Amino acid sequence: MKSIFITGIAGMLGSNLAYLLKDSYHISGVDLNKVQIGGVDSHLFSAFDLEKIRELFLQHKVDVLIHCAALVNVDECEEKPDYAQKVNYELTKNLAELCRELKVKMIFISTDAVFDGNKEGLYKETDIPGPISVYASTKLQAEQYVQQFSENIVVRTNIYGFNYREKNSFGEWIISSLNNNDNLSMFYDIYFSPILVNELASILSMCIDRNLCGLYHICSTGSISKYEIAIAIMEEFKLSGAIFQASMEDHEFRAPRTKNMGLSNEKISKELGIHISTPLEGVKEFKRLYDRRYHEQLKKG
């Protein structure tokens, strides 16, 4: 059984990975927030403590690191560029060097925001990035460093799903808001390729088992606007309330936003020989998970 170590194990991606993969691998990880999932060895300290990370790598005989920890608040990155550089680039660089030293494969979770959004259609791995925010720039720098080592994987993605912590994810926020009869304004002019975190976990498991390496876009098949996916969630969950169209052009942000974050998953789909859900198929599975009380099982660990 392979041993996998997860940074940011209490976050939405990290906790779902731990919960979903714990029966197939030995799972350990680190976070500043507490996480209790049966069969998972989680440790409460900063991923910046490389000596402790080294000790845990050796203790758990780690084969693969999935590096989820990051500063993902785009506006906070813009306000604190030095801190964003430290968390998103320097930490990743240090972990990549440790992985190289200890012969651990690294899977780096990156973002769809590395492109400038000016392309019509979906971005492929061969398209040239053009980050327009501090967040995107720091993640791209980290990507480039990690890719120096041929055994590693860089994953560009955009996820939604259920959160382990008492903090609503994007999808949960839509459900909660509509349940409270709140009116929502969603952007009709921002497009992305969101993938359900459960499906991403399954695909990452395939990547590990087949020892893939390189850069991959792991995302939904096709793209959708923020407004369209909110409407889809409302209809699938049979919620009342109102969702209004809004334009990114009418809002001021601290950090610039990318209008088109749509990614093509053709490369990973062909290499693994799989179909990845469209955004609307993903929403249907999101509802099925809700009906099966997956969110409650996840929180119980």
Question: What is the meaning of each model-derived region?
Answer:
Residues 45-87:
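NAD(P)H-binding glycine-rich loop region in Rossmannoid oxidoreductase-like domains
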Residues 164-165, 190-198, 218-236, 285:
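Substrate-binding strand-loop-helix patch
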Residues 279-301:
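Amphipathic terminal alpha-helices
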Residues 144-192, 198-199, 205:
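NAD(P)-dependent short-chain dehydrogenase/reductase
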Residues 2-24:
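N-terminal Rossmann NAD(P)H-binding glycine-rich loop of SDR-like oxidoreductase domains
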Residues 86, 90-94, 114-155, 159-162:
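Catalytic helix-loop patch of NAD(P)-dependent Rossmann-fold dehydrogenases
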Residues 203, 210-253, 259, 294-300:
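Mid/C-terminal beta-alpha module of Rossmann-like enzyme folds, strongest
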Residues 79-107:
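NAD(P)-cofactor binding segment of oxidoreductase domains
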